Amino acid sequence: MMTKKAITVLSGGLDSCVATCVYAEDYEIHGITFNYGQKSFKQELKASEEICKKMGFTHEVIDLPWLNKISNSSLTSDNEIPTLTHEELDDLDICEDTASSVWVPGRNIVFTSIATSYAESIGAEIIIVGWDKEEAATFPDNSKEFLESFNNMLNVGSPQNIEIKAPAIDLNKDEIVKLGDEIKAPMELSYSCYTGHEKHCGVCESCMRRKRAFKLADVKDPSEYNE
C-alpha cells in the first residue's frame, strides 16, 4: 500500500506546528517554508527545520523575493512592528489596525497556490495549513470562508483530488495549545515573533497571543521572551 503524502505550509509558528502534527501518523509529510523577505525568516527557518527533523518530515525553502518588493508590510519593510497590551488583544478596532500594518498582499493565496502546485507534482492528497479562528477575526485569509472557497477552486481547477486541511480553523489559540499538548506536538521548537529576534520580543501581537494562549490553556509556556 502506498503511503499517503501531504504538503504542509510551515512557518515554524505555533499554529502550523500543531496543525501539521495532527496528520503526522497518517501521512508522509513534506514541509515547505516561504522566504518572502520577512524579518523573522531566519528564526522561522530554524524552527521549521527543527520541527521537521524531530518529526521526520522532509523540508525545503521556497524563495519569493518579488513578494517583498511589492509589500509595504511592517513584516518586510523598515516600518515599525506594532505592539499591543494584553487588554488590547480583544479590541477589534485596534487589532484591525495592527493587522493592516503586518498584512502582506495576497500572502496565503500565493502560499496555498504554490503548495497546490507542489502537491500535484508529488501526488499529495492534502495541504496542511495553520489557519485558525482567532486570527480569522482580522485576517480574512485565515477564515473558514476562505478555506471553503479555496477548496472549491481546487475542485474545479486541479485534475487531482487535493484538499486543504486546516484542523485549527474552529479553534482559538489556547485551544490550539491544548491540542498540541494532547498530541505531543513539539511546540517548544516553534517560533511566533514578528521581529525575528532570537528570543520572542514578548510585545508584538503574535507574541502576546502566544503568551495568552499558553496561560489560558494552563500549559507551561516553553518560550523565552525579552519582555
Swiss-Prot record:
Its cofactor is Zn(2+). GO terms for molecular function: ATP binding; ligase activity, forming carbon-nitrogen bonds; zinc ion binding. The keyword Zinc applies. The keyword Amino-acid biosynthesis does not apply. Pfam families: QueC. It catalyses: 7-carboxy-7-deazaguanine + NH4(+) + ATP = 7-cyano-7-deazaguanine + ADP + phosphate + H2O + H(+). ATP binds at L10, S11, G12, G13, L14, D15, S16, C17, V18, A19, T20. Binds 1 zinc ion per subunit. Its EC number is 6.3.4.20. Keywords: ATP-binding, Ligase, Metal-binding, Nucleotide-binding, Zinc. Pathway: Purine metabolism; 7-cyano-7-deazaguanine biosynthesis. Zn(2+) binds at C193, C201, C204, C207. It comes from the Archaea. Belongs to the QueC family. NCBIfam families: 7-cyano-7-deazaguanine synthase QueC (TIGR00364). Catalyzes the ATP-dependent conversion of 7-carboxy-7-deazaguanine (CDG) to 7-cyano-7-deazaguanine (preQ(0)). This is 7-cyano-7-deazaguanine synthase. The gene is queC.
